[in-house]
A protein has these predicted regions:
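N-terminal active-site wall of soluble small-molecule enzyme domains
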Residues: 1-38
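Active-site-adjacent beta->alpha loops and helix N-cap segments on the catalytic face
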Residues: 1-11, 26, 46-62, 76-79, ...
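C-terminal alpha-helical cap/extension of soluble enzyme domains
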Residues: 115-180
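Generic hydrophobic/aromatic pocket-lining and core-packing "Φ" positions
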Residues: 5, 30-32, 54-55, 85, ...
């Protein structure tokens, strides 16, 4: 596993390697621990029972921790999103990510505005804000304007609702940010 990660790092020298595992916590923690020291960032769920131990170990191995919170079934109110950012900040992670499902396009702005408010008021940690689902796709493109530091794409098969493939996302980002 570690050899494969090292090969990926060599192939993608210009990119950051983020390791994330969706499945049972025990297996995920094992995979993420193996990845520490090789990956640039490990994505750990905010509800992980070993989050503090994972963060301490990652620090020793010079790997950043992205603390994430996902709601695949709803978009909370702005205050709830802001409260979740503060709660995740207290874990000691390096980057804070919230991804929630948008049923309407207007809900995309709830998460983006909460992210912007958190960044302006606290500005302690880099953040990631994503509205999942087809109605949230705009957030994957414009979130940088609201303080979000990372967006996600896939190779060919989306790993989250509303996710673009890398080629399309790159094109949309170029158009949006006029980087042609």
């Amino acid at each position: 596993f570690k050899a494969i990660l090292r090969d990926i790092k060599k192939l993608c020298r210009e990119k950051k390697l983020i390791v994330d595992y969706k499945g049972d916590e025990e297996t995920g923690n094992l995979i993420q621990r193996w990845s520490m020291g090789i990956a640039d960032i490990i994505d750990v769920d905010a509800d992980n029972t070993q989050i503090r131990e994972m963060i301490r170990e990652a620090r020793r191995k010079k790997t950043k921790i992205l603390v994430s919170h996902h709601l695949f079934d709803r978009m909370p109110e702005r205050d709830e999103i802001s409260t979740q950012f503060v709660k995740m900040e207290r874990t000691g992670g390096d980057i804070l990510k919230i991804a929630c499902f948008a049923e309407k396009e207007s809900q995309s702005y709830e998460i983006l505005e909460a992210a912007c408010a958190y960044t302006q008021l606290r500005n302690h940690k880099p953040i990631v804000a994503i509205a999942m689902g087809e109605e949230g796709q705009a957030s994957r493109i414009c979130a940088g304007d609201f303080g979000s530091v990372i967006t996600y794409s896939c190779g060919t098969v989306p790993t989250a609702p509303g996710q673009f493939n890398a080629k399309d996302l790159s094109k949309y980002l170029d158009i949006y940010y006029e980087r042609r």
